[in-house]
Amino acid sequence: MGAQLSTLGHVVLSPVWFLYNLLMKLFQRSTPAITLESPDIKYPLRLIDKEVINHDTRRFRFALPSPQHILGLPVGQHIYLSARIDGNLVIRPYTPVSSDDDKGFVDLVIKVYFKDTHPKFPAGGKMSQYLESMKIGDTIEFRGPNGLLVYQGKGKFAIRPDKKSNPIIKTVKSVGMIAGGTGITPMLQVIRAIIKDPHDPTVCHLLFANQTEKDILLRPELEELRNEHSARFKLWYTVDKAPEAWDYSQGFVNEEMIRDHLPPPEEEPLILMCGPPPMIQYACLPNLDRVGHPKERCFAF
């Protein structure tokens, strides 16, 4: 009798247990584990690969807690890296070039500011040189998500005026972007999010400023996106020092470049900016104003 009850119990419970396991697997598959569970917690992540992109730019790949983890960073947000360097805590913001479509790792493309290369900054960049010195297997602390802007898809941006304010929703048909140097990383994040959705009609216009042609970060990725999605992504460069047979603009961002290569004010686009503060203050904002782009439709990362 006991054996019969045991068998009966097994027969009754097996389908339930099977269904439970199936539901759990489906749930786990649809909701990957998130690394950045709280913006107030630091998460140590291990360096697993370092790629030399050019003379001063590197791609750093860090492992997430498991191959099934995603970073958990909303589009438009950034992370902070923190490390103790020469006895002092150094914290710097960065935007990954990978996304939550990538499981198990996060990629950062970072320009290394070496000492004794820029007369105004003889010590170079503390964090970028620290990253350059890291060996495979070393860890560094990540914290996030952080930032005032989130792209929600289909042209919808949620923007907070400050950290304590509720977000204001702006829905646009086109986005104008001005990036300088490493300021390209948040732009690429938004561009990729828009283009990967075939039902997102938003058009991106990027004006990308650099010192020289060789300083153009992520150029292959940008031009591949432009070539494959020419109706949805417009790309233009300007460099301070142009080589011979240069097909793009030369000089600082100016009114003419904004008129020619960003969407007009009549389209009511959102204008995104990221780059050195002097570029934003003296080149972008005054010339955007001259062209007619209102301040409430301009956002600087």
UniProtKB/Swiss-Prot annotation:
UniProt cross-references to Pfam families, sorted A to Z: FAD_binding_6 (PF00970), NAD_binding_1 (PF00175)
Gene3D superfamilies: Nucleotide-binding domain of ferredoxin-NADP reductase (FNR) module (3.40.50.80), Translation factors (2.40.30.10)
Domain named FAD-binding FR-type: residues: 40-152
GO MF entries: cytochrome-b5 reductase activity, acting on NAD(P)H; FAD binding; nitrite reductase (NO-forming) activity
Residues recorded with modification N6-acetyllysine: 42, 50, 120
Subunit structure: Component of a complex composed of cytochrome b5, NADH-cytochrome b5 reductase (CYB5R3) and MTARC2. Interacts with MTLN; the interaction is required to maintain cellular lipid composition and leads to stimulation of mitochondrial respiratory complex I activity.
CDD domains in UniProt: cyt_b5_reduct_like
Positions bound to FAD: 92-94, 109, 111, 114, 126-128, 185
Full protein name: NADH-cytochrome b5 reductase 3
Modified residues (Phosphotyrosine): 43
PROSITE patterns reported in the protein's UniProt record: FAD_FR (PS51384)
GO cellular component: endoplasmic reticulum membrane; lipid droplet; mitochondrial outer membrane; mitochondrion; nitric-oxide synthase complex
Membrane protein topology class: Lipid-anchor
PANTHER family reported in the protein's UniProt record: NADH-CYTOCHROME B5 REDUCTASE, NADH-CYTOCHROME B5 REDUCTASE 3
Chain residues carrying a lipid of type N-myristoyl glycine: 2
InterPro entries listed in its UniProt record: CBR-like, Cbr1-like_FAD-bd_dom, FAD-bd_FR_type, Flavoprot_Pyr_Nucl_cyt_Rdtase, FNR_nucleotide-bd, OxRdtase_FAD/NAD-bd, Riboflavin_synthase-like_b-brl
Reaction equations catalysed: 2 Fe(III)-[cytochrome b5] + NADH = 2 Fe(II)-[cytochrome b5] + NAD(+) + H(+)
EC number: 1.6.2.2
GO biological process, one term: nitric oxide biosynthetic process
UniProt record similarity statement: Belongs to the flavoprotein pyridine nucleotide cytochrome reductase family.
Cofactor entry: FAD
Record's subcellular location: Endoplasmic reticulum membrane; Mitochondrion outer membrane
Superkingdom, natural source: Eukaryota
Role of this protein: Catalyzes the reduction of two molecules of cytochrome b5 using NADH as the electron donor.
Keywords tagged on the record: Acetylation, Cholesterol biosynthesis, Cholesterol metabolism, Endoplasmic reticulum, FAD, Flavoprotein, Lipid biosynthesis, Lipid metabolism, Lipoprotein, Membrane, Mitochondrion, Mitochondrion outer membrane, Myristate, NAD, Oxidoreductase, Phosphoprotein, Steroid biosynthesis, Steroid metabolism, Sterol biosynthesis, Sterol metabolism
